[in-house]
UniProtKB/Swiss-Prot annotation:
Entry superkingdom: Bacteria
Organism: Streptomyces coelicolor (strain ATCC BAA-471 / A3(2) / M145)
Gene encoding the protein: metN
Topology of the protein relative to the lipid bilayer: Peripheral membrane protein
Pfam families: ABC_tran, NIL
Taxon lineage: Bacteria, Bacillati, Actinomycetota, Actinomycetes, Kitasatosporales
Key word Ribonucleoprotein present: no
Family according to the record: Belongs to the ABC transporter superfamily. Methionine importer (TC 3.A.1.24) family.
Enzyme Commission numbers on file: 7.4.2.11
Protein name in the entry: Methionine import ATP-binding protein MetN
Main location as per UniProt: membrane
Annotated residues for binding of ATP: 38-45
Key words of the record: Amino-acid transport, ATP-binding, Cell membrane, Membrane, Nucleotide-binding, Translocase, Transport
């Protein structure tokens, strides 16, 4: 549904160049909620503005719903008819609402339909339908100043849906909201994704947003995508920065002659007493140094940091037992020799 290839954006000012996007390749499948996460300055907002060509990319291509927007844009400063038509399939939700204070809630939602030349009757019908969809049917005649932050964002979402888009872009839509309101807006986005079949690309710096509603995610740093995939794939990837950030665990070894493991479990494995089975089977004392568990996409997923007595070479068999149970195991304090042994064990398990 959304594909970027070699997407590059360079800003030039007073003889200086700043590269905001550096060859970004991204693919968002139809009907999924895709989160792009990263710190301030990572290039997230530049990415989403290039996806709908609010910013013209310096290089690379953007394809949305089968249309190559970069080809449609041409070289002129203004958008042509074909590009405007392609953009009509894209809705945008902003961080700061951008509602017109002199217009009622209904009139704000009707604004895109006015621009499209729809009749007053059609505009009114569509706006009221959308306000009901976002839970604001009783606020149609209110003004933005009379609304809470969460209600304003709901109006922004309704306005973004006025043109019946196939894709919804969300640029930090919850960052100015309190935690409870954030949860309600995220649930609304997920409901719209399911009810309308919307493809949602959202930009955020909050890990909880990714955990709450995202099917897939990408981590950006300094204008590049450093990791991407489904949340499940990322959690199963050894050494994944995004997985570690989604489920952070801490704790250091109590001595040099100890093995520290990060254990990632999900699905059925999350409900099995694997650690106690390991302790009984091999008659070893296991220390739990840290743990985090949550529900992602309806599945229980968690990470645990445990300590085993003895060096890694002494624990190859117990580690193999854990991997046989379908768990992802990362050895935190392994030496180069232990790393080689660990890699060999993974290969054996894959045969």
């Amino acid at each position: 549904m959304i594909t970027t290839s070699g997407l590059t954006k360079v800003y030039r000012s007073r003889g200086r160049e700043v590269t905001a996007l550096d060859g970004v390749d991204l693919h968002v499948r139809e009907g999924e909620v895709y989160g792009v996460i990263g710190q301030s300055g990572a290039g997230k907002s530049s990415l989403i503005r290039c996806v709908n060509l609010l910013e013209r990319p310096t290089a690379g291509t953007v394809t949305v719903a089968g249309a190559d927007l970069t080809a449609l844009a041409g070289r002129g400063p203004r958008a042509g008819r074909e590009l405007r038509q392609a953009r009509s399939r894209i809705g945008m939700v902003f961080q700061h609402f951008n509602l017109l204070s002199s217009r009622t809630v209904q009139d704000n939602v009707e604004l895109p339909l006015e621009i499209l030349g729809k009749s007053g009757k059609e505009r009114s019908r569509k706006a009221l339908e959308l306000l009901d969809l976002v839970g604001l049917a009783d606020k149609a005649r209110a003004y933005p100043a009379q609304l809470s932050g969460g209600q304003k964002q709901r109006v922004g979402i309704a306005r973004a849906l006025a043109g019946d888009p196939k894709v919804l872009l969300s640029d930090e839509a919850t960052s100015a909201l309190d935690p409870e309101t954030t949860r309600s807006i995220l649930q609304l986005l997920r409901d719209l994704n399911r009810q309308l079949g919307l493809t949602v690309l959202l930009i955020t710096h909050e890990m909880d947003v990714v955990k709450s509603i995202c099917d897939s995610a990408a981590l950006m740093d300094r204008g590049r995508v450093v990791e991407s995939g489904t949340v499940g794939e990322l959690l199963a990837t050894p050494g994944s920065e995004l997985a570690a950030a989604l489920f952070p665990v801490g704790g250091d070894a109590s001595g040099d002659d100890r093995t520290v493991l990060d254990v990632t479990f999900h699905g059925e494995a999350a409900t099995q007493p694997v650690i106690s089975q390991l302790s009984r089977t091999y008659n070893i004392d296991i220390s739990i140094l840290g743990a985090a568990i949550d529900t992602v996409g309806g599945l229980q997923i968690g990470r645990m940091r445990i300590e085993l007595p003895g060096r890694y070479e002494d624990n190859v068999v117990p580690v193999g037992f854990l991997r046989e149970q379908g768990l992802q195991i990362d050895v935190v304090n392994e030496t180069p020799d232990a790393a080689t042994a660990s890699a060999s064990l993974v290969k054996e398990g894959a045969k």
